[in-house]
A protein has these predicted regions:
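Positively charged n-region of N-terminal signal peptides that target proteins for export
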Residues: 1-4
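Bacterial N-terminal signal peptides
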Residues: 7-17
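Sec/Tat signal peptide C-region and signal peptidase I cleavage site
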Residues: 19-23
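Flexible, low-complexity segments enriched for small/polar residues
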Residues: 25-41, 46-58, 94-98, 319, ...
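Active-site substrate-binding loop specific to GH73 endo-beta-N-acetylglucosaminidase modules
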Residues: 27, 127-147, 151, 155-163, ...
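Extracytoplasmic
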Residues: 43-44, 68, 221, 356
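A mature extracytoplasmic/lumenal domain signature
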Residues: 53, 65-68, 179, 220-222, ...
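N-terminal accessory alpha/beta regions
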Residues: 56-208
Length: 617
């Protein structure tokens, strides 16, 4: 079976690239008029659920088919109200571990900054330096590493919480657009170093992600996670830092150029940077330091005035290029990679004419004939998060499995929530389908269907070899200096006595031990951060087959293909799947094989999920 899977995955690179690059044209392409009720069917309803959410079960597809296109799109876009709130009563707030304390603020830029502060003031991170004795600043160092480790682990829990919302929400477009904005306003926890700020930013995307773009943009620009990520604190009067202004203009609003014409100049960036001087944050709040703001006249995008940051944002929103840039990026996310100039201009006008309200734009896109055209359907290569959540959805799971680990699995595929690689977000499209990544996608399916009995929870088992070695040596009773001595540095022979003497001296004289602090930080973090539940996927494929009254291998294969694949597979692939199932069952009679049906079905589904067509949505 492994040989079949690998061959399919490697061949799939060419198949997927061809499917995305050479999708057939039809009369619906680039037509933004609404699709009619007469043209509505189950295939298009399933397509809508895939793109505006994370897919659906056959029951979901049947319900949206019966609604018709206008009602179906309205239900997805207009998700606020009492009925929707009632449908989402099961969605609980994030269950905090309670790991933060006020002494952590403001968190130092690094370990040296923490110990320098402790040395200068006698206190840092809410911890006082010991008056006398060995390693007087060790508790400060321990606290520093504790917060780094605890915030990372709590962020992983936050990602699980969000993935469960994606899976079970009655408002899938809310979470789908939150995922879009997370990649658009891309900040990562490694730089922000505070899960609370990442959580606040996610809540902003969930609350305003389908509302008014101006409100969302100002909220994101003044968000503590964004300000921390883009080093806003160093942007002050007399020494403006252009990084913040450049990212807002280049990545978040206008784009560098439209049709080869620059949308702004380097002078515009410098002047915008002056307008943003004084913007900073304090803990979880936006803070505007008036004494650090440049209040002089600025010249920006052809306008002159004493502009502040919000006024600069409004000037940016007044540019036609901004509405077109945002509308086109949303189109590429929901529809397809290539957007024609005509469509870009129409959608930009739609957004601008509605004063940057996103809901009318989303309705226009999702109702358009273009959205259901051949170039748009089954041509989107699913992101790792889309792949994982849509897989859980099609399996009708009620919770994200703990095995395999959701964060590690999606990270191996190239997308770990709250950890985008750059401020530009994650790679899109064909970059997701290298041979190595396709093999990882097959491995994800395998680990989901056949959980690894040797699985070690990454939030409990430290994967840093150095920390594991230190932990082992401490458990053996070694003193701190000996336990933290780098491996392979022993002198041998008589040098051991000299090393013992130097170790003893170090134990007496050092102010702190960084390696011990790193170990102790992990130890404290795992004590305080709540563990991620590790229940594997609760599957009953045999029960599913029985409920559908499927009698032979061909019926089983056709049912599973229809449920999991958005387009028809090659006849030869279908025939191989049927033959595979017959061989595993030892018969074509599914009823006769009831007592041992589950494992062959899981093997079959692994093959289906490893097909190149399964990567498309």
């Amino acid at each position: 079976m492994r040989k079949i899977v690998i061959s399919a995955l490697l061949f799939g690179c060419a198949v997927l690239a061809g499917a995305v690059s050479h999708a057939a044209q039809d009369a619906l392409a680039d037509d933004l008029t609404p699709i009619s009720r007469q043209d509505w069917n189950a295939v298009r309803a399933a397509h809508l659920l895939e793109r505006a959410g994370f897919g659906g079960t056959p029951d979901d597809v049947a319900r949206f088919t019966a609604m018709g296109p206008a009602a179906a799109v309205k239900a997805l876009v207009d998700f606020s109200g009492a009925a929707q709130a009632d449908a989402n009563r099961h969605l609980l707030p994030f269950d905090e571990s309670g790991i933060h304390d006020p002494g952590l603020e403001p968190f130092p830029t690094g370990r040296p900054a923490a110990t320098d502060q402790a040395k200068a003031t006698g206190e840092a991170l809410g911890i006082k330096v010991k008056p006398t004795g060995n390693r007087r600043m060790q508790p400060v160092v321990d606290k520093f590493f504790y917060w780094l480790r605890a915030s990372r682990l709590e962020t992983d829990r936050l990602a699980y919480w969000w993935a469960n919302r994606m899976l079970t929400t009655a408002a899938p477009l809310q979470e789908k657009m939150a995922l879009f904005w997370h990649g658009h306003f891309a900040n990562n926890e490694e730089k922000v170093r505070d899960y609370r700020k990442m959580k606040r930013q996610l809540e902003l995307f969930q609350a305003k992600g389908t509302g008014n773009f101006r409100d969302l943009l100002i909220g994101a620009a003044q968000d503590p996670a964004m300000l921390a990520f883009l080093d806003a604190g160093v942007n002050v009067k007399g020494a403006p830092n252009e990084n913040f202004a450049r990212e807002i203009m280049e990545l978040f609003t206008m784009g560098v150029a439209s049709n080869g014409v620059a949308n702004y100049s380097e002078t515009d960036i410098r002047e915008a940077a002056r307008a943003f001087t004084g913007w900073n944050y304090q803990d979880l709040s936006f803070k505007e330091n008036a004494d650090k703001h440049d209040g002089a006249v600025k010249k920006f995008l052809g306008q002159s005035g004493n502009f502040d940051g919000v006024q600069v944002i409004d000037l940016i929103l007044g540019q036609p290029a901004t509405a077109e840039f945002i509308a086109a990026k949303i189109y590429r996310y929901l529809v397809r990679e290539d957007v024609s100039d005509a469509v870009r201009k129409q959608l930009g006008a739609e957004l601008r004419n509605n004063r940057y309200e996103l809901a009318p734009l989303l309705k226009k896109i999702l109702l358009s004939r273009d959205f259901y055209s051949a170039p748009s359907m089954a041509t989107h290569i699913k992101s790792p998060v889309e792949l994982a959540v849509s897989t859980y959805k099609k399996l009708d799971l009620k919770e994200v499995p703990g095995v395999p680990d959701f964060n590690d699995a999606t990270g191996a595929l190239g997308q770990r929530l709250f950890h985008p690689p750059t401020v530009a977000g994650w790679a899109q499209g064909k970059s997701r389908i290298t041979p190595g990544l396709l093999l990882e996608r097959g491995n994800f399916a395998r680990d989901l269907l056949f959980p690894n009995i040797n699985f070690l929870p990454p939030d409990r088992y430290n994967q840093d070899e150095t920390i594991r070695i230190v932990s082992s040596k401490i458990d053996q009773g070694q003193d701190v200096s000996t336990a933290t001595k780098p491996e392979g540095k022993g002198m041998g022979g008589g040098g051991e006595a000299m090393q013992s003497m130097s170790t003893a001296m170090a134990d007496r004289d050092e102010d702190f031990n960084t390696r011990y602090g790193s170990f102790r930080g992990w130890q404290l973090a795992t004590q305080k951060v709540k563990p991620i539940p590790r229940r594997p996927a609760q599957l009953d494929l045999a029960g599913l087959v029985r409920s559908q009254k499927l009698l032979n291998a061909t019926q089983v294969v056709d049912y599973l293909l229809a449920r999991f694949i958005p387009l028809a597979v090659e006849n030869a692939d279908r025939a191989r799947l049927v033959d595979f199932l017959k061989n595993e069952l030892g018969t074509d009679d599914v009823v006769q094989a009831q007592s041992y049906l589950e494992e062959p079905l899981r093997l079959l589904l692994h093959l289906i999920m490893s097909l190149p067509e399964y990567q498309l949505g």
